Amino acid sequence: MKAAVIGLGSMGYGIAQSVLRADHQTWGVDINADAVARFVAEGGQAGDLPSDLNAVAVVVLNAAQTESVLFGPQGIVPKLPKGAVVLACATVPPDFARDMEARCASHGVHYLDAPISGGAAKAAQGALSVMASGTAEAFAAAKPMLDAMATTVFSLGDGAGAGSAMKAVNQLLAGVHIATMAEALTFGMTQGVAPEKFLEVISECAGSSWMLENRAPHIVAGVYT
């Protein structure tokens, strides 16, 4: 398979590494030249995408960036061969995902609504969770890339939108967990509980959560990058 990952940030870089590790020819694209150079040094490809590309994961920030990558002045969809698939991994509104699916279909390109979860470490391990929805053809075309980047792929429907709806549910809970964790940490500090001890104890108790275990160490260390 010939694949590309557009967006080599904390999540996209790990996805690109995982796809490359699965012995697929993999192109990395990013406005950050250092990220691209690092990927090339690890065996990846850069430069113009091949005309016979099979799959593209778009791992950017939001709907506006996704649309720009797909249909902007340098948009990739009109250049993709018929039967190729776009895996759209950003968190976007469900209606936007449905619109992108229809626009891709008009070019003979499959669109898989494929928001991701798991964090940078799991992206690098090829162990993400993907909340996916799309046609059977989109799933089939995306399978080699999904197999490389994820250990859990939820099939949530036969059209785009359902995956993004589920991601919105996940993000609501994630936001609540982060806010509650911050309030709990602050409360503990007012009671004389050291932040380091808060993290040590609560991580092993019923009040823990994935977001606490993933984000609280950064907060306690004062590292917000």
Model-derived segments and spans:
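NAD(P)+-binding Rossmann beta1-loop-alpha1 motif at the extreme N-terminus of oxidoreductases
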Residues: M1-V58, A84
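Hydrophobic beta-strand scaffold residues
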Residues: T26, A46, H110-L112, V153, ...
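Rossmann-fold dinucleotide-binding core
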Residues: A3, T91-Q171, G175
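Helical "substrate-binding/catalytic lid" subdomain
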Residues: A162-T225
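Rossmann-fold NAD(P) dinucleotide-binding segment
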Residues: L49-Y111
